[in-house]
A protein has these predicted regions:
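Active-site rim/loop-helix segments in enzyme catalytic domains that contact anionic ligands
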Residues: 1-102
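Metal-dependent de-N-acetylase/amidase catalytic core
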Residues: 1-9, 88-266
Length: 266
């Protein structure tokens, strides 16, 4: 499976979301020659107990840029504020305009079911944009140089934190990507977000920012190894959007080969 379009877009609600969700997979795709684009809808303006919204926004923007430089990715901020991401007309047109500008072949974003509404609304806006971007008569007000896309891209949802929805119900991924050889790069990229350690310790009771990510990716790898019989120390996990008009084949399996391990139910 090949395409002349080598662009991959990863969209998170806040700076550091993409790093946590899927940066190991992005490093793997970068090694294959893919062009990586990372979007944060907000600058994380509520993510501090020490700084004002303006101060923490500047800090987190710089942190996100440094992290993306390590990945060799282009970084964008979509102009939203924390806790103010909504599924409305203006927001849909804004994200659609950005998607048209980048014109990705593969898109990764949050799970539709997650622990906070910013993540869930981001997931919905990205899903909408993947579909809307290819409709010529759907007009956007900014980035007007970008025309409609020719195809609907592959769309993948990363696993929510702890693999659960808001009711604590387990969300089983469709497949896992072995990122064992890339975990150090992922750690270095996530470590760029220094401002978040104090915030997560105070608000979420999470003192071990990096170690929490390691444990989560290790638990995903344990399941991946169990179902596949392959060795994996760290893994990321995804579900593919398989609704009408979206691509149905798993392009990750084609690109990453033995590095992809699929749940038997799929």
């Amino acid at each position: 499976m090949t395409s002349e379009n080598k662009r991959v877009l990863a969209v998170g609600a806040h700076p550091d979301d993409v790093e946590i969700m899927c940066s190991g997979t992005l490093f793997a795709l970068r090694r294959l020659g893919y062009e990586i684009h990372v979007v944060s809808l907000t600058l994380g303006d509520c993510g501090s107990i020490e700084h004002s919204a303006e101060e923490i926004s500047k800090i987190r923007h710089c942190e996100a840029q440094r992290a993306c430089e390590m990945l060799g990715a282009s970084y964008y901020h979509a102009g939203f504020s924390d806790l103010c991401i909504f599924n409305d007309d203006e927001s849909n047109r804004r994200i659609t305009a950005l998607l048209r500008k980048i014109n990705p072949w593969i898109v990764i974003t949050h799970s539709p079911q997650d622990y906070m509404s910013d993540h869930e609304m981001t997931s919905l806006l990205v899903r909408n944009a993947c579909f809307y971007a290819s409709i010529p008569n759907y007009k956007t007000k900014d980035l007007t140089s970008a025309t409609h896309t020719s195809v609907i891209p592959y769309l993948y949802y990363a696993q929510p934190i702890e693999n659960i929805d808001i009711f604590g119900k387990q969300i089983t991924p469709q497949f896992y990507v072995n990122v064992s050889a890339l975990i150090e790069q992922k750690i270095k990229m996530l470590s760029c977000h220094e401002s978040q350690r104090n915030w997560l310790r105070a608000h979420n009771g999470m003192d071990e920012y990096i170690e929490s990510m390691r444990r989560w990716n290790a638990s995903l790898a344990e399941r991946a190894a169990q179902i596949s019989g392959k060795s994996a120390t760290f893994a990321e996990a995804f579900r593919q959007h398989l609704g009408h008009a979206y691509p149905k084949d798993n392009v990750f399996a084609a690109l990453l080969g033995d590095g992809v391990m699929t749940e038997p139910a799929y």
